[in-house]
Amino acid sequence: MTKTELKPILVFDSGIGGLTVLREARVLMPERHFIYVADDAGFPYGGWEEGALKERVIALFGRLLAELDPEICIIACNTAFTLVGADLRAAYPQMTFVGTVPAIKPAAERTRSGLVSVLATPGTVKRAYTRDLIQSFASQCHVRLVGSENLARMAEAYIRGDALADEAVLAEIEPCFVEAEGKRTDIVVLACTHYPFMSNVFRRLAPWPVDWLDPAEAIARRARSLVPLPNGFEPLNGEDPAIFTSGRPDFATRRLMQGFGLRVMADAVSADRRERI
């Protein structure tokens, strides 16, 4: 398989949080081109009704797979994958989907206090998938689920360079910090790919030090294990394409994409198709 024959890797998120996963995946798969897809027309996913979101994502992937023909798809969005992952695999059995789920298992393995918090969107918190992970891997721990209504939007603003009030951020993360029977929360799972961009802010504002668990590297390792590595490959240079379902990313977003080595495609998903999403 030559370099020109290698199919790209599709990285999908509701917004720009999936860039945390893209960054790690590029390190592990330097021989591949990537296509970043942001469903910003539907952002944020956390407040969507489940049936409507499921229908939207499945239909969108039907078009993306037909047009882009990727090697695999990385769903860099906890909210989407915990809801739609099984349905995507059933609808498109020829495609390999690498999912993003709350990193509850590694958190349970690392905690010393037994107090773990999961910072997520409301959608991820209410999924049976998330509670099944807790039952399967963290039944011996006290796991607090914290569903933030605002933090994904705040993270998008922060990534674009907007200033955020410390008090507003603290109000979102403070419920993660639990004290019980002389013990304290020692791990917070970042169960939204937007949140790691704000990890330094979280550390600065945290009532006490904790391990902020970012799953991006583990997701990238899983993807690498599923993608064939050709002999004699050379690392690729140049920009990769980015697709926004709104077709209208603002200037700050375009500049951010350039910083990640991405160029925004003007007409990768045609307007008439977007209207039917």
UniProtKB/Swiss-Prot annotation:
The keyword Nucleotide-binding does not apply. Substrate binds at D13, S14, Y45, G46, N78, T79, T193, H194. One of its GO terms (molecular function) is glutamate racemase activity. It catalyses: L-glutamate = D-glutamate. It comes from the Bacteria. The keyword Cell wall biogenesis/degradation applies. PROSITE patterns: ASP_GLU_RACEMASE_2. Pathway: Cell wall biogenesis; peptidoglycan biosynthesis. InterPro entries: Asp/Glu/hydantoin_racemase (IPR015942), Asp/Glu_race (IPR001920), Asp/Glu_racemase_AS_2 (IPR033134), Glu_race (IPR004391). The active site is at C77, C192. Its EC number is 5.1.1.3. GO terms for biological process: cell wall organization; peptidoglycan biosynthetic process; regulation of cell shape. It is an enzyme of class 5 (isomerase). Keywords: Cell shape, Cell wall biogenesis/degradation, Isomerase, Peptidoglycan synthesis. NCBIfam families: glut_race. Provides the (R)-glutamate required for cell wall biosynthesis. Belongs to the aspartate/glutamate racemases family. This is Glutamate racemase. It comes from Rhizobium meliloti (strain 1021).
